[in-house]
């Protein structure tokens, strides 16, 4: 079984549990060992909270400091001198004489800690509260409401961006259609110019052909007349 070790300054155990529950709604949080160190035993003057949890939950990294096994043991060794804790907790899932094993069900707000070392509890471990402070509950509800409002606002922004994106797509489609039509018009104009040029060439050729035919016809008539005159002239001299 893998564990995760958390450390948080200026926080109570209950606050840490509330934050973990808020990050893991509907999940069961198993705490294998916790050390809620308080100055002079007063609940309002908590110095730090040290937790050993199963690693199947999500951690709010912005508020907790994540420790490795050596860092956890180092901090625990510091507590050993101050609080007369004899044994360092092992990584096994079964609770030992120095471990406090408690389970926080997802359906309940609090749970009673189980421990076989009452002297350790009285000297180093703060009492686990049965009821969550109402102010903290209200604060969490306000945070949830704010998050929900932010989510709704972001969803509206996303919807607006999608609409804008669709409009841009429609604009692009329209522009593409316009470009296609312009290309077709240009091709048709080129065909028209080609036909006009061919027509002008044909007309010029036809005119030249008509001129040549007319000239040939005139020459033909001229030679016929000349031939007729010659024939008549020869017959006149013959008689």
From Swiss-Prot:
Residues 107-127 have a biased composition (Low complexity). Keywords: Coiled coil, Membrane, Transmembrane, Transmembrane helix. It is a single-pass membrane protein. Residues 104-127 are annotated as: Disordered. The chain crosses the membrane at residues 211-231. It comes from the Eukaryota. The keyword Membrane applies. One of its GO terms (cellular component) is membrane. Disulfide bonds: none annotated. Residues 134-202 form a coiled coil. It is found in: Membrane. This is Putative uncharacterized transmembrane protein DDB_G0281105.
């Amino acid at each position: 079984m893998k564990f995760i070790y958390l450390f948080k300054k200026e926080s109570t155990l209950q606050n840490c549990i509330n934050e973990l529950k808020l990050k893991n709604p509907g999940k069961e949080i198993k705490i294998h060992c916790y050390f809620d160190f308080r100055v002079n035993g007063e609940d309002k003057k908590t110095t730090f909270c040290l937790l050993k949890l199963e690693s199947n939950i999500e951690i709010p990294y912005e508020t907790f400091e994540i420790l490795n096994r050596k860092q956890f043991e180092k901090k625990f060794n510091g507590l050993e001198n101050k609080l007369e804790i004899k044994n360092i907790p092992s990584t096994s899932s079964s609770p030992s004489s120095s471990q406090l094993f408690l389970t926080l069900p997802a359906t309940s707000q609090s749970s009673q800690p189980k421990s076989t070392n009452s002297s350790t509890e009285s000297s180093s471990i703060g009492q686990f509260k049965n009821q969550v402070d109402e102010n903290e509950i209200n604060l969490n509800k306000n945070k949830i409401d704010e998050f929900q409002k932010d989510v709704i606002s972001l969803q509206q922004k996303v919807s607006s961006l999608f609409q804008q994106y669709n409009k841009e797509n429609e604009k692009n489609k329209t522009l593409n259609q316009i470009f296609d039509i312009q290309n077709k018009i240009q091709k048709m104009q080129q065909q028209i110019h080609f036909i006009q040029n061919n027509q002008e060439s044909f007309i010029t050729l036809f005119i030249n052909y008509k001129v040549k035919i007319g000239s040939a016809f005139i020459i033909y008539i001229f030679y016929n007349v000349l031939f007729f005159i010659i024939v008549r002239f020869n017959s006149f001299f013959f008689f």
